[in-house]
Amino acid sequence: MKKFDNLGLDNIKEIFHNLSYDELNAHEKANNEGLSTDNDTFCVDTGIFTGRSPKDKYFVKQDPSSKYIAWGKINQPITKELFDKLLTKAKQELSGKKIYVQDAFCGASLQSRKAVRFVTEIAWQAHFVKNMFIRPSQEELENFKADFIVYNACKCINEDYKQDGLNSEVFVIFNVEENIAVIGGTWYGGEMKKGIFSMMNYWLPLENKLSMHCSANVGEKDDVALFFGLSGTGKTTLSTDPKRRLIGDDEHGWDDEGVFNFEGGCYAKTINLDPEHEPEIYGAIKRNALLENVVLRADKSVDYADASKTENTRVSYPIEHIENHEPSLKAGHPKNIIFLSADAFGILPPVSKLSKEQAMYYFLSGYTAKVAGTERGITEPQATFSACFGEPFMPLHPTVYARLLGEKIEKHEVNVYLVNTGWSGGSYGVGKRMSIKATRACINAILDGSIAKCEFENFEVFNLAIPKALEGVESTLLNPINTWLDKNAYTETRDKLAHMFVQNFKRYEDVKEGIEFSKFGPKI
């Protein structure tokens, strides 16, 4: 118990430290924390919070970190006094109880990883941490020294939030100087995952290393590919390839040695999960995986089509559950980077080659377009721009990440492509969704290098280089103007989308890099 004195908890009844999967499973069952499915996967309900609470996330405003953090709606400031008050409250919640302490690494690169200790009173949350982070060896556990501690007091709420000037009784707070995070009022496991991701996005760029919200895989010739894209763009599907080993599906770093996964597991959406279309994820849901907010049938099988609790049903599992993964969780420098956008306006080409400067522009734009349905059945796509394809998790100014990306692209001569997995031949409602077959053909041509041999032409207004012909893709598809019957509607929509890009980018022009990068966007 002595080694846990620095946690600041009183009268702890018992500490369950780094339990095995079997031990965690026994505790989950004994504590009645959920149910087991027909194949013995444990399944929990995260309560009213079935997703992250971005409006309740704060950083303590103090020096020296205050001069690096980009303060605003995403990185909200909180005082040291209020942090201390809520940390004390969380510690009181965790005192006098049985607690679970789970130690893990974030980052598969020895020179860049961080050691994180998680403290919780819920066994399944320790299980989630064991799945999602890198599991230390026995020797590493014996010499474990935490760089950062997360207190997860999910049962603790802040009743005084109004007088404290906060948004709700939930709080997720990061104290960079003291290397502590505290979570209260939400049971959602993803807060721990994305919280440490946010911290990696603070630490690494200050060490001149890039942190990224992307998936990564590696081919038989050790050629590494990175896939960036917002939710619904096909990032997980397209990076899962039987011919390539999965490095990771969501969070990566890029240091002097190459690319490395931050995590030791995957956190996949399970809504409408189909064993035929996503056999790898379906096969990964077995003992040691942890299902969240799914609905079980009477025979304890999972009804993946049931969204009655939430659309955001999830499963976490150790990456070993994916057969074709890269065991070291790392590889060399990327050969190709692919930005995925599901453009519901039907304007972006199926594939375009980007210059280094354009890569920085489209990385900062982080564009996709979602389809919003209305009750009368009228649909108008909604443009979504998320800096660096992961704005909610980036504590520094987005141009910091873009500059690092540009430097690495140049140094390692990386090819960068923009791939549209969205609509063609018209906007949503008129055009049709790009076929997965055509998108796969574009991705394969990038990965096998055959696209480099193509003849390219300029795509007007956006000034993108697009291939004139590409094996496996109808030539008419390659330039969007050829796929629209109504050319006037095409020109109007193209100019409208270009204008959205330009307007969005104005927010980066508060720094000189932003002004510099803005030259490489669409020209209206």
Curated annotation (Swiss-Prot):
Localization in the cell: Cytoplasm
Keyword Protein biosynthesis listed? The answer is no
Q: Which SUPFAM superfamilies match?
A: PEP carboxykinase N-terminal domain, PEP carboxykinase-like
Q: Name the enzyme's class.
A: lyase
Its EC number is 4.1.1.49
Q: Which biological process, per GO, is one annotated for this protein?
A: gluconeogenesis
Report which reactions are catalysed by this protein. Answer: oxaloacetate + ATP = phosphoenolpyruvate + ADP + CO2
* Pfam families, alphabetized: PEPCK_ATP
Where along this sequence does the record place binding of substrate?
A: 52, 188, 194, 314
Q: Name one GO cellular component term.
A: cytosol
UniProt keywords, alphabetically? ATP-binding, Cytoplasm, Decarboxylase, Gluconeogenesis, Lyase, Manganese, Metal-binding, Nucleotide-binding
Show the PROSITE patterns listed in the entry: PEPCK_ATP
Q: In which pathway does it act?
A: Carbohydrate biosynthesis; gluconeogenesis
Binding annotation for Mn(2+) = 194, 213, 250
Q: Which residues form the signal peptide?
A: none
Organism domain of life: Bacteria
TM ranges = none
What one GO molecular function would you report for this record? metal ion binding
Please report which protein family the annotation says this sequence is part of. Belongs to the phosphoenolpyruvate carboxykinase (ATP) family.
Q: Which NCBIfam families match?
A: pckA, PRK09344.1-1, PRK09344.1-2, PRK09344.1-3
Q: Main role? A: Involved in the gluconeogenesis. Catalyzes the conversion of oxaloacetate (OAA) to phosphoenolpyruvate (PEP) through direct phosphoryl transfer between the nucleoside triphosphate and OAA.
Q: What is this protein called?
A: Phosphoenolpyruvate carboxykinase (ATP)
